[in-house]
Amino acid sequence: MLNREDSYNIYICGVGGQGIIKTSVIIGEAAMNEGYKVVMSEIHGMSQRGGVVSTELKIGDYKSSTIEKSNADVILSFEPIEAVRALNKANIDTKIVLNTSPIVPSTLNQFNQSYPKVEDIISSLNDNYNFVYPIDGEKLAIESGSLLSLNMVLLGGVIANDTFPLSKKSIIKSMKNNLHSRFHEMNLNAIEKGYDLVKNS
């Protein structure tokens, strides 16, 4: 629950095709259903499959539509290296939820560069931030029924944080309102798997 004068800032990033925009819409609708003001920034980058995408959500009493430097309460990264790129939005107590499955951009091969080891990315984050939650999102999504539920696995991880102002119930209601009924059970399973992983970490 937010105080009237507070805002809660969520930065979501990854690549196109991972469900980033849909995740943002689900959070935003849940916030409005709970009576909060909410604004979602313009999408940066290309939303088609493979292009970098980021959205910024501000819930509550916001002064602008963008998240200022070091002011994110949560960074939700669908791709490990994108979490690193988003760190200008983070402070030491920002909750960082990241998918551990990399999507290696073709540009790395073009310039004979290699993708950093995911373990090194996570280790560096743990050295510098208090709340880092790596999730093998692809594994849990497949266990839930389909890789397409990856975004709901990661969203489940976000809402497990004690400071998250929205209830799991309202997130689930919004998910059901935004996805076809035949996908409800799979995505509910995905939310629960991500939620349980972070709650028990």
Task: Write out the residue ranges for each language-model feature.
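Active-site cofactor/cluster-binding pocket
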Residues: 1-201
